[in-house]
Amino acid sequence: MTPKEQSPTTLLISSRKDPAGSLIHEELYSFLEDDKRAHSHIRHWHAEERLIYLDGPSLPHDADRILFLSRHASERPRPVLTVHVTGNFGSADYGGRPNTLTPAATGLMHALINRLIIHAPEGYEVMYEATHHGPTDIPLPSCFIELGSTEKEWNDRIAARAVAQAVLDALLMDTSSVIPLAGFGGTHYAQRQTEITKLTRGGFGHIMPTRDIPHLTDALFQDIISSTGAFAIYIDGKSMSGKEERMITGLADKHTIPILGQGDLMRLFDLPFSEYMSIRNLAESLIPGSSIVLHTILEMPAPVSLTIPGELVDEVMKVAAEEFISALDSFPIVHMTGRGKACHPVFITDAAFSGRISDELIHLCVTLLQDRYTCSFEGDSLIIKKLRFDPKKAKNLGIPSGPLYSELMAGKPVEVGDSVIYPEMVMTETEKRIHIPQRQAR
């Protein structure tokens, strides 16, 4: 997310009945006197009534998006700066129409959260709120930014100035790299979604908290996706029942909407989302039901699969799984998990790298095995020689099963009567051959 020379035109709306919104607007005017960059891209409108009761179609339309500057109120007041889009999943208790959602300015919301985190005064929390209240029937993408939660905060000029600075920064940001997400689950104050936006390119539009999931229908799910412009959804599974999570997952599958977790988003880095989806689709065609883990990928315009010997990967995963997976971060590849395996022998990389990557992965596996076993090659076969504890040999030497076996397996000698038994005396060598076709000498 970077500053952008050509920004969308934004309509800033505050209410004369709202002390916090008016104060934020006042501070914005002050900033704009000194910073002319945004003048041509900002329109101002001061409503006479409360914002939540505005009539959407009556609002000015000479802009690309709307940002409402507002106070925040709560039954459990605390100093907080929030961002959310409007709409009602059910009844319209606080403005707007029931069962109606507005288009979300999802990219702007991502920018606002991150700039608020930078500028928030000490003692103020920053977070998304779940979708709630009016106005609805707004034809333009929009969102609220709020300062709360009591008269003390509404009249806090330092906080209002911080919000104004965050707004001005966000309006000038290029948000084209943001991945629009719809969120499901959690409380009204969407802490998990806020954390995701803080750490990743994932930005949320509509967020349906757990309390509103009983309202969810197929039609409403589609409305949430379209009103957000969502590329994918995030499910806070820990905050809901298994039945609720399965219902949401089923709707996502039905409408071919990807489900992304925080880990997925953390690994996306700057990878274009279209390329990420190409990788996911290829992985699904290779191993249905698998999950993907990205490693150091900035772009992958031509994803292809490569396969190395499955026995080789299995051997490495038995003895050096953590080291192997960690080492994959140095490769521009994707590994697949699931269906009983932490790493399948099928990988995805860009076509430009596939030949080299295949050789390097095999070399990595062999190196990790050589650190633990005696390994050699005969032609295209890797020979792995292992020493394993042989209970028959131990028994023949008069060693009773139990703690002494553990000592020997740990490489320690033991005493039986007047005799000292060394570990190598109770070991048997086994040999495993793995065919590695077209292995290149290194």
From Swiss-Prot:
This is D-aminoacyl-tRNA deacylase. Its cofactor is Zn(2+). One of its GO terms (molecular function) is zinc ion binding. It comes from the Archaea. Its EC number is 3.1.1.96. One of its GO terms (biological process) is D-amino acid catabolic process. D-aminoacyl-tRNA deacylase with broad substrate specificity. By recycling D-aminoacyl-tRNA to D-amino acids and free tRNA molecules, this enzyme counteracts the toxicity associated with the formation of D-aminoacyl-tRNA entities in vivo. Binds 2 Zn(2+) ions per subunit. The keyword Signal does not apply. It catalyses: a D-aminoacyl-tRNA + H2O = a tRNA + a D-alpha-amino acid + H(+); glycyl-tRNA(Ala) + H2O = tRNA(Ala) + glycine + H(+). Monomer. Keywords: Hydrolase, Metal-binding, Zinc. NCBIfam families: PRK14866.1-3 (NF011436). Pfam families: tRNA_deacylase. Belongs to the DtdA deacylase family. It comes from Methanospirillum hungatei JF-1 (strain ATCC 27890 / DSM 864 / NBRC 100397 / JF-1).
